Design a protein with these regions (language model features):
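Generic anion/oxyanion-binding catalytic loop in active/binding sites
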Residues: 16, 51, 123
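Acidic/histidine-rich, surface-exposed loop or edge segments in extracytoplasmic proteins
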Residues: 40-48, 108-119
Length: 177
């Protein structure tokens, strides 16, 4: 009797393992420096990570990953609520970082100085020439404001805001509203 049941139990375990692996692959976050996600509808701020740090992670994890682990080519600075990542080649200002409030990461930001490290759709956004180029990549924003100085494109349903100021493009990821 045991000999007959064993293959069925093994088959069930194998199928369960395959299901778990597939589910974890589907829920994999968009690591800004690694993944080539190109579907704008698939991007939500809770799935975004910056060198492994996601919105909602503890301050301890952010400090450990961004400050204590050495990231090649990046200098880390901490000021008040922010952990800034600065390009060692051209240390003109932060190229990315996180904001920590109440012991948790509540915002991730990147700008066009981080474009060379970014993969996927946001590399194209950071290298955009106009707000219209950004709309072609991401679709029309939930709301925004455009004037002679630049544009603010808010994609609140996905949890990010793009500030376009001529040559400077900033993207802020925050919890979905």
């Amino acid at each position: 009797m045991k000999a007959r049941i064993r293959p069925y139990v093994q088959a069930c375990l194998v199928l369960a393992m395959i299901g778990l692996i597939a589910a974890s692959a589907y829920a994999e976050p968009y690591e800004l420096s690694k993944n080539d996600v190109m579907d704008p509808k698939a991007i939500k701020s809770p799935d975004i990570s910056l060198f492994g740090v996601k919105i909602g992670d503890s301050e301890a994890k952010a400090m450990d990953v961004l400050v204590n682990e050495k990231i090649p080519g990046i200098k880390v600075e901490q000021e008040a609520l922010f952990i800034f990542l600065v390009d060692q080649r051209k240390p003109t200002g932060p190229m990315a970082g996180v904001r920590v409030q109440d012991g948790k990461v509540d915002m991730i930001f990147i700008n066009n100085r981080f474009a060379y490290k970014t993969r996927g759709l946001f590399r194209n956004v950071l290298n955009s020439e106009s707000p219209e180029d950004i709309r072609k990549l991401l679709g029309h924003e939930d709301y925004g404001d455009e004037n002679v100085m630049g544009a603010v494109l808010a994609y609140d349903k996905q949890g990010f805001v793009i500030n376009y100021l001529g040559k400077d493009v900033n993207i802020e990821f925050s919890p979905v509203h």
